[in-house]
Structures are given as C-alpha cells and as structure tokens.
C-alpha cells in the first residue's frame, strides 16, 4: 500500500486497464500482486523516461520468442501509455512489462524469470549443437518442446520436480534412443552446473522424448 501512495492516480488507472486487457487476452490466472508490482514498475519507467534514461532489454529476443503472448500484452501496454501520456516507450519496455505478466502467471520473481529465460535458451543451444539440428520455430514440435522447458524451469524454481516413478520406461528410452537420452543427461548436467538444480531420471526421460 505504501508503494502506491505517491503514484499518480492516472498511472494507477492505466495500469489497471492494462492488467484487465491482459487477463482477458491471456486467459490465465494472474497473481494479485501484479497490481502493485506493475503499477510501481510503470510509474518508475515513466519517471526514468522523463529524465531521458532508456534501458536496453538484454533478453528482448528471448522474451518475444518464449513468452510471445505476454510480449504482446507488453506491446499493448506501451502503445496505450505512449498514446495517453505522450511517452516514447520502445519494445525494450514492452519486454520488461511482459516479464511482469510471466511472474504473475507462474508465481515467480523477476530474477527467477530472467534465470528461467536464460536457462531455456541455453538448453535449446545445447540441443542444437549436440544433435546437429536447426529448429523449425514455427513447428508444433518446437512449440511443445519450449512449453515443456518452461514448465521444467518453473518446477525447478518451485522445487516441484518429478520423482523417479517410470524407471522401466526410462531404461527403454535410453536403449532405443541413446543419442537423445545422452543429450538429455547433458542438459541435466548443464542445469546442475549453471543453476544448481538436480533433475530426476524421469525429467531426463521426458526431455529425451521431446528431443
């Protein structure tokens, strides 16, 4: 509540309109905290712009690719703000706003969301190199794989990883698809080394299925 005390009413109303639009178009449950966090973010972004400060979004490309619907909500937000307030927000800011919707959707922090986005990109690069393939980013298989990686990252940060319950099927996968299974084990090693998380044999098996 204290955060909102010094924020202009117009900024609060515009943020509320943006969230209402996003709820309708994303068709997901959003954590109620977004009303405070996004209002604070937008107010601060307006202040920064008034001072001539522009922030580059280092993850903009990844956000547009992995969280495209949330990015479109961010784009709607900057278009509305630019129209109503005369600001000149770029798509960098649309990306930052998109992350707030990702946080509210997956119930994570902004730092976790940055880390999860980097992790997904790192895994995709690893698979491309190990399997010597190029992804068709328009394909349903690619979309399903990215969706699986998003939920894997979410489970990792929530400490809700799958337990080893499909041991026999995992062995079958390892024997039938040794290359894909080996690649999945390398993904597990990458996650442990870079993010300190250990994933189960069942998680490795599901990665192999998608690969």
Task: Describe the residue ranges of each PLM region.
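A cross-family "folded-core" feature that marks the main globular domain of proteins
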Residues: 1-211
């Amino acid at each position: 509540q204290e955060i909102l005390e010094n924020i202009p009413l117009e900024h609060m109303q515009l943020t509320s309109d943006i969230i209402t639009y996003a709820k309708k178009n994303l068709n997901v449950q959003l954590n109620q905290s977004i009303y405070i966090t996004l209002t604070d973010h937008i107010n601060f972004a307006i202040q920064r712009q008034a001072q001539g400060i522009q922030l580059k979004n280092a993850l903009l490309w990844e956000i547009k690719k992995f969280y495209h619907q949330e990015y479109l909500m961010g784009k709607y937000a900057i278009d509305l703000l630019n129209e109503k307030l005369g600001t000149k927000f770029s798509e960098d800011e649309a990306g930052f706003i998109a992350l707030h919707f990702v946080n509210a959707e997956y119930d994570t922090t902004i730092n976790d969301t940055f880390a999860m986005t980097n992790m997904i990109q790192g895994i995709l690069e690893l698979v491309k190199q190990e399997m010597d393939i190029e992804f068709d980013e328009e394909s349903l298989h690619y979309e399903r794989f990215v969706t699986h990686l998003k939920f894997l990252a979410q489970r990792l940060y929530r400490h809700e990883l799958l337990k080893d319950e499909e041991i026999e099927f995992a062995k079958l996968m390892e024997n039938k698809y040794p290359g894909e299974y080996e690649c999945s084990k390398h993904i597990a090693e990458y996650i442990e080394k870079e993010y300190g998380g250990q994933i189960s044999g069942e998680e490795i098996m599901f990665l192999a299925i998608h690969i």
